[in-house]
């Protein structure tokens, strides 16, 4: 699955970090990848951008409630398919 647009958020708390990456694909799916804290990894697939954004907002509220703060935002990183 090729990602068309990626947006990333980095949350930190002390030496811990959580990176959230939202990717839209050419087939209309929305992927939410959560890396951290530590070696934890999760991936979620949504067929509706609103559902994806709601899940992400809830996740961000939980992170802030646990003492994480938004460190960095990277928006609209367009990817092009690699040629073989």
Predicted regions and their residues:
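N-terminal helix initiation/capping motif
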Residues: 78-79, 83-84
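A short, charged, amphipathic alpha-helix used as a generic interaction element across diverse proteins
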Residues: 47-65
């Amino acid at each position: 699955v090729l990602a068309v647009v990626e947006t990333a958020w980095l949350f930190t708390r002390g030496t811990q970090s959580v990176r959230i990456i939202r990717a839209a694909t050419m087939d209309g799916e929305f992927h939410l990848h959560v890396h951290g804290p530590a070696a934890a990894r999760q991936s979620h697939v949504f067929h509706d951008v609103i559902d994806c954004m709601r899940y992400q907002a809830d996740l961000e509220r939980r992170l802030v409630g646990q003492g994480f703060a938004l460190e960095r935002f990277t928006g609209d990183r367009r990817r092009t398919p690699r040629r073989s």
